[in-house]
């Protein structure tokens, strides 16, 4: 694999070679919780960017180019979003921060012993401009509604992107 933050690509070529020989790719992406410079989420580690940290999108694009069935395992403890990943892979499993028994639970789901059902209890923002997400309002925010003719004349509320979540 690769380091989840920074520009280090060490291990990427080896990981892609292993993936090329696999029937199914389990692509683990997201953040790393903890303290210090290698962490991307945690106490005192703030970010203005909700895209995948480091070279992870590049890694995901190269894995996609292998044309293999791929299940994305998305680890994070804060909002992370990537439009390429959301629109190109066979399945995405939001793993959050799974804890001590997370690997056992994940294996049960991946091998069909458990069947996760339902929908995420949260909305995944497309970009940082959609944050914070207002869960109590039907259109996401009290400031934007279809046909609004006040100060914000763009009915989506954005001049450069859609208001639709991923």
Regions found by a protein language model. Name each.
Residues 1-88:
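Hydrophobic helix-and-loop "lid/oligomerization" segment in the mid-to-C-terminal part
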Residues 1, 75-166:
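Secreted, periplasmic, or luminal enzymes acting at the cell surface/secretory milieu
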């Amino acid at each position: 694999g690769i380091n989840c933050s920074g520009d280090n690509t060490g291990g990427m070529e080896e990981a892609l070679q292993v993936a090329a020989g696999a029937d199914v790719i389990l692509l683990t992406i997201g953040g790393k919780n903890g303290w210090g410079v290698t962490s991307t989420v945690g106490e005192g580690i703030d970010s203005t960017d909700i895209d995948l940290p480091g070279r992870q999108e590049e890694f995901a694009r190269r894995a996609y180019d292998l044309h293999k069935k791929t299940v994305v395992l998305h680890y994070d403890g804060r909002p992370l979003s990537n439009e390429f990943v959301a629109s190109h892979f066979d399945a995405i499993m939001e793993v959050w921060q799974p804890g001590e028994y997370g690997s056992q639970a994940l294996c049960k789901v991946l091998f069909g012993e458990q069947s996760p059902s339902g929908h995420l209890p949260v909305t995944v923002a497309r970009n940082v401009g959609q944050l914070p997400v207002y869960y109590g309002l039907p259109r996401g925010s009290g400031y934007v509604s279809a046909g609004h003719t006040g100060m914000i004349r763009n009915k989506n509320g954005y001049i450069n992107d859609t208001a639709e979540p991923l």
